[in-house]
């Protein structure tokens, strides 16, 4: 237990170090800084960042331990999964629903974070031993069905993501819409429903691209995949950011956390059933 805690602590430090390095590099490039709705108390922000980093490290450690392949394979799979969500998809979402800005800076910073934490995770936590390469696992994965079957199933997964998003997001929208309509806490509503559909379709493609390498390298049961992937998705797609958004009231963050948890678990189980 003590050894595990020590490893998680080191992974958290690597995440923080990657964030700091990415932030300094982004600043040196002169990228636009985010404009938070109120001045940040850096001490409080640091506490929340450290706590959220621990959660990310714990989630990724469990994910990495279920992956087959060598360390380089697991590093690439984990780093891409983290960056696809924390560097790309979350930035797209923030651009649509917030006025904070700084999405390019965040994308660059998250690249450093993703590489740093993924490196620490695969060095400190062993994966499942596998005598095959990722390329052979990839061929085996897609050999299970015909091209027509894969086309249909992948299309359903891409379409399912926006549907899941709206199923759980619409009830939450009824609860928190006033905050978005009044531009409270740096929030805003998208310009139109059509724009929102387009954005979620783009995010759906990145979500699938982030999940496929994990499915290929996965060496546990499908049931375990549904839970492990779903919880990891919850962490990287929302919990990490919501834990640090301390300027928002707890009620708002809690409602969105429940929404994202249901989104993520449902999407994880859809992947399990369809792919």
Protein language model features and the residues they cover:
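Juxtamembrane/disordered regions of integral membrane proteins
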Residues: 1-275
């Amino acid at each position: 237990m003590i050894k595990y805690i020590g490893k998680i602590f080191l992974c958290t430090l690597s995440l923080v170090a990657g964030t700091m390095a990415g932030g300094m590099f982004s600043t040196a490039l002169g990228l636009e800084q985010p404009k938070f709705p109120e001045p940040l108390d850096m001490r409080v922000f640091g506490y929340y960042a450290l706590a959220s980093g621990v959660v990310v490290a714990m989630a990724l450690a469990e994910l990495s331990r279920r992956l087959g392949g060598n360390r380089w394979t697991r590093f690439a799979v984990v780093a891409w999964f983290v960056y696809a969500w924390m560097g790309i998809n979350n930035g797209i979402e923030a651009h649509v629903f917030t006025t904070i800005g700084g999405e390019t800076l965040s994308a660059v910073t998250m690249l450093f974070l993703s590489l740093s934490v993924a490196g620490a995770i695969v060095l400190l936590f062993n994966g499942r031993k596998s005598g095959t390469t990722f390329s052979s696992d990839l061929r085996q994965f897609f050999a299970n069905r015909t091209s027509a079957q894969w086309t249909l199933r992948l299309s359903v997964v891409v379409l399912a993501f926006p549907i899941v998003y709206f199923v759980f997001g619409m009830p939450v929208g009824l609860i928190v819409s006033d905050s978005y309509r009044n531009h409270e806490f740096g929030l805003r509503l998208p310009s139109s429903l059509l724009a929102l559909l387009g954005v979620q379709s783009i995010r759906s493609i990145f979500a699938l691209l982030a999940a496929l390498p994990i499915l290929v390298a996965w060496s546990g049961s499908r049931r375990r995949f549904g839970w492990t992937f779903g919880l990891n998705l919850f962490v990287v797609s929302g919990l990490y950011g919501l834990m640090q958004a301390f300027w928002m009231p707890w009620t708002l963050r809690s409602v969105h956390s429940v929404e994202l948890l249901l989104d993520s678990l449902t999407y994880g189980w859809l992947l399990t059933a369809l792919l």
